[in-house]
Amino acid sequence: MKYAAHSRTYSTNNYYFCPIIYKSTNYCTMTQDELFKVLVAHCKEYGFIFPSSEIYDGLAAVYDYGQMGVELKNNIKQYWWNAMTRLNGNIVGIDSCIFMHPRIWEASGHVSAFNDPLIDNKDSKKRYRADVLIEDYLGKIEEKINKEVAKGRKKFGDSFDEEQFRATNPNVLREKAKYDEVHSRYVAAEKANDLAEYKQIILDCNIVCPISGTCNWTDVRQFNLMFSTSMGSTSEGANTIYLRPETAQGIFVNYLNVQKTGRMKIPFGIAQIGKAFRNEIVARQFIFRMREFEQMEMQFFIKPGTELDWFAKWKENRMKWHVNLGMGAENYRFHDHEKLAHYANAATDIEFQFPFGFKELEGIHSRTDFDLSNHQKFSGKKIQYFDPETNESYTPYVIETSIGVDRMVLAVLSHSYKEEQLENGETRVVLSIPAPIAPVKAAVLPLVKKDGLPELAHEILSELEFDFNCQYDEKDSIGKRYRRQDAIGTPYCITVDHDSLNDRCVTLRDRDSMTQERVPIDSLRSIIDSKVNLNNLLRNLK
């Protein structure tokens, strides 16, 4: 294979090029559980995510972001922030405090209603969310049905009629009847908040503890998820306050300040990125469910009566934002809520196909005027909006979009992690992170640590580092350095060789295809920018 540039020919037989070309894109065979464990280990090994307080044996469900993880996280946040505030002239930002007046959480309903139904297995001493146990059971039934459908499709080929198959196949009908019965009981129990029925469903379905394998369950109990602490100089004079369980309330209590000082007219939105805290009794699946996490929320204030139209628009808008990353539209789906939260009249989740199944990535809710009306009631302050066009005052309705930053990080990492079988039998580990949000955009690699190559490499680095997060690496063979960059998701590697001193050209290697081309040093910035600039993603959203 040859690469031509400026009348010169560079052969892949030259030792400084990566000598391994794809035989095929075959991923190593692993179960989803095995893949997830490998991913967690990879995140630690390459500086993405560490267990918090590890030298003290860690703290359950609390994680720290390393040097690669914080770059990825910041890039995701920038993508969201710019999509919200730059592409929408009627959406502005805010940064509210974690500590707020405790009455805020009474008004929002969190003090009385922010609970999870939990159940313990007496043999393993492990605690679980009862609703999640039932939902996972229903998910397994769905998997059985889908497997039967897949078998039918394989058997009948092009003549396969899925609708007819689902309506007539005895195995599908049997599983569907089982699903419908359990699902209807579950929905009724949710609406009635019937904790005894939760347990009865678990017993009737013979749902066992994953650890002990037994059905020896306690009764289901409700646990409030808010962390409380004290504010004051002495314990006697201290007031109980809460670490915020969501960022939304900081927007609601400030919405009128923003509206007046920004001369905002309805419809308008307020965006915020910030930490939230929930005392998750059952925290698991790595950074998917943590006790300290980060949210990206936007509250969109609208005229009452228009909420369902705006709800539909924001559903479409948010799904487009996700799919725009290029991680496959088939990996996303909407899941409408059957049991609505106390503040909502419509709600849906955007779910992503994680290694452990489709799970919530973002929530979109029509919150009506619940929050603003309650804050007006509890504070005694009028916080209505005066509409100059209709000359009337009213309490706006709100459409909320809420996404977990940590879940987005996990979605990107779990989708991007690949182990590829190469022609020489070796396995290449690569993170095919979308280039605009990759932690490192380019690595500058001198072929050897002498003959003036490091000096030229540093010259290139000093020009690129103003525009991109770059790395310099001169240790080990060029092949090993390529592998290190593949493992952290660097889209481009720039190899500086002896010919570079004369022709001022370098070898640019693409992460995903491993193809290489000879390019002038003066063209590097524009070539890389065309692939990794975040604005490329944003333009697709217009």
Predicted segment positions?
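N-terminal amphipathic/basic-hydrophobic helices that include classical n-h-c signal peptides
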Residues: 1-29
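NTP/phosphate- and nucleic-acid-binding module
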Residues: 16-17, 27-542
